[in-house]
């Protein structure tokens, strides 16, 4: 397949399962070099040689194959870079995550890809997602491993959620053992992200892998509801899209943006068995608040009761496999977190 098809429509090319006749070249009138690294992996770099202070930015979507809006936004970003409509001021790796699931219109085929990073894919060798997790780890490691010493490293992993949310667009920051950075929180404010969830334990997500193993400022963005390809109102994603484009092009963030509210994970509901009962409505919104003493779950001898004056539930899902998380409980820590930004 001619490389022009890849560069004109990265999404359509990837869904078709083709490989380009040429795997690298120049675009944007010679100002940008591109390289196809494999299915759903497209790297860009300015042709100019002043690389010493150049940031390295990984932007991903489609880690869940049915989360189409961010995939469409990322394909448009690549198209505009190729055409020279968007200047490039960084090393950039564009990643479409779970390509087989995208083609099938499914969240995943065998296992949730966003639970298979940091080597966990080795525990499920028969899973059709396992090789992709290993490939994405290797691509991120190689990309950030080639970054100029001391330069900024970013990973923005874009998703949409299965359920509604009290805060329509929110972010999750992986646990790294250090406080969130002011750079990340201010960027999230510029993206008009209303809330940030801070993890307090290591995980197996893509953004956790790049934060821990690649030294990236990493976040997972939840940008709205899951919809089929072509049925998204992309205007609802405009603030986040603008912020990503500014990060890629070296543009300045708007001053005075409201910083997001911050919530910290204080517990989780773990599914012990198929007898798990979640005492919340099937369509309960993420970040719905519950008061002290409310029983939220029961599974045999296990019971989860709200311990703080107010706790909010995020990602409740009783249909996960036993042993996996069936919900997170968070509390508001905005004041303390923003005061401790570094």
Swiss-Prot record:
Bound cofactor: record note: Binds 1 zinc ion per subunit.
Top EC group: hydrolase
Keywords in alphabetical order: Arginine metabolism, Hydrolase, Metal-binding, Zinc
Binding site for Zn(2+): 64, 67, 159
CDD domains: M14_ASTE (cd03855)
Pathway(s) it belongs to: Amino-acid degradation; L-arginine degradation via AST pathway; L-glutamate and succinate from L-arginine: step 5/5
Gene that encodes the chain: astE
Gene Ontology MF annotations: hydrolase activity, acting on ester bonds; succinylglutamate desuccinylase activity; zinc ion binding
Top-rank taxon: Bacteria
GO BP annotations listed: arginine catabolic process to glutamate; arginine catabolic process to succinate
InterPro entries: AspA/AstE_fam, AstE_AspA_cat, Aste_AspA_hybrid_dom, SuccinylGlu_desuccinylase
PANTHER family associated with the record: ASPARTOACYLASE, SUCCINYLGLUTAMATE DESUCCINYLASE
Annotated disulfide bonds: none
Signal peptide region: none
EC number(s) on file: 3.5.1.96
Protein name: Succinylglutamate desuccinylase
Family statement drawn from the similarity comment of this UniProt entry: Belongs to the AspA/AstE family. Succinylglutamate desuccinylase subfamily.
């Amino acid at each position: 397949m001619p490389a022009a098809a890849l560069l004109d429509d990265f999404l359509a090319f990837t869904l078709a399962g083709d490989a380009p006749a040429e795997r690298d070249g120049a675009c944007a009138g010679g100002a940008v070099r591109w390289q196809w690294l494999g299915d759903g992996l497209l790297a860009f770099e300015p042709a100019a040689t002043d690389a010493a202070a150049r940031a390295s930015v990984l932007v991903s979507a489609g880690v869940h194959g049915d989360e189409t809006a961010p995939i469409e936004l990322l394909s448009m970003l690549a198209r505009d870079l190729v055409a020279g409509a968007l200047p490039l001021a960084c090393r950039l790796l564009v990643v479409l995550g779970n390509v087989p699931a995208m083609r099938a219109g499914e969240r995943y085929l065998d296992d949730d890809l966003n639970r298979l990073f940091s080597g966990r894919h080795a525990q499920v060798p028969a899973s059709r997602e396992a090789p992709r997790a290993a490939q994405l780890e290797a691509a991120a490691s190689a990309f950030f491993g080639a970054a100029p010493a001391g330069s900024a490293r970013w990973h923005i992993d874009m998703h949409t959620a299965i359920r509604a949310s009290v805060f329509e667009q929110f972010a999750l920051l992986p646990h790294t053992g250090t406080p969130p950075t002011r750079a990340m929180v201010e960027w999230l404010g510029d993206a008009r992200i209303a809330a940030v969830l801070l993890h307090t334990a290591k995980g197996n997500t893509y953004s956790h892998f790049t934060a821990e193993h690649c030294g990236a400022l990493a976040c997972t963005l939840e940008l709205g509801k899951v919809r089929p390809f072509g049925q998204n109102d992309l205007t609802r994603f405009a603030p986040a899209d603008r912020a990503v484009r500014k990060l890629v092009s070296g543009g300045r963030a708007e001053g005075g943006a409201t910083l997001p509210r911050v919530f910290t994970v204080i517990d989780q509901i773990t599914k012990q068995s198929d007898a798990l009962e979640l005492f919340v409505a099937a369509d309960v919104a993420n970040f719905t608040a519950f008061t002290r003493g409310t029983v939220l779950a029961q599974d045999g001898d296990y019971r989860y009761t709200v311990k703080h004056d107010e706790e909010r539930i995020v990602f409740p899902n009783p249909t996960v496999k036993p042993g996996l998380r069936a919900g997170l409980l968070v509390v508001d820590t905005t004041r303390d977190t923003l005061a401790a930004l570094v």
